[in-house]
Amino acid sequence: MSQDLLTEQIKDAIQGAYRTWLSARDFKPRRGQREMIAQIARTLGQAESRVCVVEAGTGTGKTAAYCLAAIPLASTIGKTVIVSTATVALQEQVVLQDLPDLKQRAGLAFSVSLAKGRGRYMCLKRLDDHLKYQDQQEIPIFDVSNEDFSVLYQEMLNRYSQGSWDGELDSWVEPLPDGAWTGVTTDHRGCSNNRCSFFKQCAFFRARNNLEGADVIVANHDLVLADLALGGGAVLPAPEDCIYVFDEAHHLADKTQNHFASSARIQGTLQWFDNINNVLGTATQRFARPANLVGLSTNVASETTALGDIFTDLSQALSILPFEPRDEERELYRFPLGDVPVSIAELCTAALPGMQRLCDGIERFHELLSDAVAGNQDWEKAFEAEDWLLPVGQLQGRALATLNLLQDYAQGVEQDHRCARWINRNQYDVEMVSAPIEPGHILSEVLWQRCYGCVCTSATLTALGSFQRFLERSGLPPDTPATSIASPFNYPEIATFHVPSMQSDPRDFDAHSDEVTRLLPDLLSRERSALVLFTSWRQLNAVVKALPEDLAEGLLVQGDGSKQALIAEHRRRIDEGEASHLVGVASFSEGLDLPGDYCRHVVIVKLPFAVPDDPIDQAIAEWAEAQGRNAFYEISVPDAALKLVQACGRLIRHERDYGTVTMLDKRIVTQRYGRALIESLPPFRLDIASVS
């Protein structure tokens, strides 16, 4: 390849597609959108270091920008564009609206495929088994509830056979009862792939076949991370062949942290050891005790016995830790700086050889089942081997997860990369947990060093005007090209940031809750529509309970129904001229699209600082302080600024929107960091009362 991949031909293709799209939409060029297209094209056209970060304010048109820049270039050099989102809502918008619009109006020819995990698809084999064996009593291999879903499962089969349903969870219209879906889906260990009798009709493989040769694949962060964790190229194309676009990229570090966390419950594991012996023993009996299975199940039983003794000792060692109560049902102990005491690390080390042998034994058992499915084992009833792939595969997955946790704790005092480690305890069990506090090193290893190119974008990537926190958490070098593009909206003319006179300190739960309760009736009477955001369920419940009954009964409170149902009811009320007020916590502070009259007022009850007793946040702060840094100003305040911008972003979604954001936390005025938080917001018109 030449030094500069961004040839005049590719530039002309990008510019031509943009002009064609603007003309077809009767749009005028947006400066911010053009700037975003240029930045992405320049980065992806470089000979190396093809990663950039673009913060694009609401109204920029970022989806069109990154598609118009990436697709023509990827097409020319034979790469696949992977558009990854954090939410289903944006994923559906990209697939159903944005990409079809570009195909139709920009003159670009490209194919699109939607990628979802195997667990989102119905498994015909499991569905058929449930219907076939629903009247039988002896089905130990199925892990389902006692509830009879046979009528529902028959309807699923009918619709799939008729072509009125594609076998995908999100396209099933009616709500599914709890437990119904898990009975008819599987994972990669429970799937016999092309050896399955239903392979040609399989919903998952039909969808996966559509990925082959697709120019653009739309996925989500969880699926991309799962693919990368498997080495890349397992579900999606290999990273070296992909240009990734992470939309809603501010979620990427947290998603990575969650994906690569590990945990194990002590009593649950002891019970699981018994389950291993039950499953393998029953399978061995089912196939008339062939010698190879008898040997494996006997060896595995020996390992579970020895491991059970170690886990019992581990339970005793953990029980003497100085736990602190977190709520009425749970206690927690966090290891300072993630250092595991030698006595506990030694027990985990002692368990490693046996756990490795257990993993190997279950894996070999699973391999023999696969051989039987392929017709390579002369067992009695070998035709039933496929039925056992899922339960044995689930044992295999849990064994590997437990091994990873033990390895983490065994190395807890000597690892290169820092982890938060803590113990949860309730009256039933003790849980060991570990989570990376530097997810960036994982992303660097599995993504940044391997991918052909990548664009990270969102409306909220800077904190207090700097990309430093995002780059640090994501594992990107400080010199990564990073651009912030302002929203085209005229905020001073259309939006007000209001801080009323407040008496209470938000850190005084009772006093602040009482004052919020007194202020809300008047605040909510000012507009027909409002979104009220709390930082904790505890305060939300306390305030809603204390509000006047006539007001409280009309609120649409998160948790009283599904998110979709609440929003639908909210829209119905506004459409019919009624008042409607949504009330929720952090998950309502982003991802809600309530344009126009659907949201004229956002009330933020408290500054969105992280929960002070979260073990991961505590560990991050502890490490920062150990390095001589100020954790509050370097971590807590920037993170709160980012969340505050996201919450305020619920107000203005389109250029004709207007309204008010009200902040019921006087610290934004009285504390030293308050001015920095205000300056990080869009340029609202400020209405700040004198604060006591």
PLM region spans:
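A substrate-engagement module of RecA-like helicase motors
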Residues: S2-R19, S23, K28, T58, ...
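Conserved RecA-like P-loop NTPase helicase motor core
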Residues: P500-D510, D560-V669
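Conserved helicase motor "Helicase C" RecA-like lobe of SF1/SF2 P-loop NTPases
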Residues: T535-G559
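Signature of the SF2 helicase/ATPase Hel1-core->accessory helical subdomain module
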Residues: P72, A89-E92, Q97-P100, H188-R189, ...
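A contiguous, basic/glycine-rich beta-loop/short-helix subdomain that forms a polymer-engagement track
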Residues: T182-I217, A226-V235, F365-Q503, D510-H512, ...
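Walker A/P-loop
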Residues: Q46-L68
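Conserved interdomain hinge at the start of the Helicase C-terminal
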Residues: E445, P500-T535
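Walker A/P-loop NTP-binding motif
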Residues: A41-T43, T63-I77, Q97-D101
